[in-house]
């Protein structure tokens, strides 16, 4: 079984806190050091026993030396600063992971900031979260049964990747691997686009002169569709900008589909409108059931 003496979590929020709790639950880490720019977050993490030691950003390079595992759980646009912060504390065998929702950009800054230590960085993206953020929402079970996507680097050794897989398995997760470019394209479609739509809908309705009436009658359908608009604006701003090209491609495809749908409604094309909705309902039901047999990728 894997075992780590010292875990350093940079960014003590929902994901970083849940990771620490999951490894504590699995009894594979002896000490957790939390590093954050927010004193309030660090105090909450100590009070909730998510971390054992709290360090400010300025104290981290010295206080966190000797770490054998480092997790970067900060917004993707803060990754460059995070890599620069941790480089001095990396031993020869320290493993570094991120939790970023975009990969090509994070890998780029890792190469720049880590230099000869880049082989110690194994990019990871846990597909888990909640619409609430902050360490108070951290949960040891957050990753149970969830996918974690690794996008290994050419510089990574097989042993480093295997150890990272073991780490996430200890958290209760399932592990899959793909290229960084494939990752960014996939999640632009199924994660980043839905978040943008939820933010846009709530913002548009809230700006209307009759917003009070609209929200007073909003019910379960609106709540379900817009749940993810409660997510961290800072995190999702960074994701949108860092995965801009892939996200714009998906937004254009969605706009085209919405225009098509508008045309069906405008022309009262009941047959095609019904067919579109039926296809959508059936595809969603198959996805929920885990029946992906009728879905095809171009390469298969």
Model-assigned labels for residue ranges:
Residues 142-227:
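Internal alpha-helical scaffold of NAD(P)-dependent oxidoreductase catalytic cores
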Residues 6, 31, 120, 147, ...:
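Residues at the starts of beta-strands that form the adenosine-phosphate
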Residues 59-97:
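Rossmann-like NAD(P)-binding element
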Residues 1-65, 69:
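NAD(P)+-binding Rossmann beta1-loop-alpha1 motif at the extreme N-terminus of oxidoreductases
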């Amino acid at each position: 079984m894997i075992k780590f003496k010292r875990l350093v979590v940079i960014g003590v929020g929902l994901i970083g806190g849940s990771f620490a709790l999951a490894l504590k639950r699995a009894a594979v880490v002896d000490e957790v050091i939390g590093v954050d720019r927010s004193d309030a977050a660090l105090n909450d993490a100590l009070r909730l026993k998510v971390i054992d030691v709290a360090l400010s950003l300025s104290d981290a390079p010295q206080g966190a030396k000797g770490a054998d595992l480092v997790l970067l759980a900060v917004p993707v646009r803060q990754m460059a600063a995070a890599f620069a912060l941790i480089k001095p504390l990396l031993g020869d065998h320290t493993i570094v992971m991120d939790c970023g929702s975009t990969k090509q950009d994070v890998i780029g800054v890792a190469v720049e900031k880590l230099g000869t230590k880049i082989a110690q960085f194994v990019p990871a993206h846990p597909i888990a979260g909640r619409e609430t953020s902050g360490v108070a929402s951290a949960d040891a079970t957050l990753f149970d049964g969830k996918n974690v996507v690794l996008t290994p680097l050419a510089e990574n050794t097989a042993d480093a990747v295997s150890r990272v897989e073991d780490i996430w398995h200890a958290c209760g997760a399932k592990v899959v691997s793909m290229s960084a470019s494939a990752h960014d394209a996939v999640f632009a479609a199924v994660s980043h686009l839905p978040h943008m739509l939820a933010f846009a809908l709530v913002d548009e309705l809230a700006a209307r002169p009759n917003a009070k009436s609209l929200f007073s009658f909003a019910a379960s359908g609106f709540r379900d569709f817009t749940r993810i608009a409660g997510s961290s604006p800072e995190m999702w701003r960074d994701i949108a900008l860092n995965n801009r090209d892939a996200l714009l491609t998906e937004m254009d495809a969605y706009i085209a589909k919405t225009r098509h749908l508008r045309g069906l409604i405008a022309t009262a094309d009941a047959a095609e409108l019904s067919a579109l909705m039926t296809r959508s309902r059936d595809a969603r039901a198959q996805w929920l059931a885990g029946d992906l047999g009728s879905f095809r990728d171009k390469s298969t």
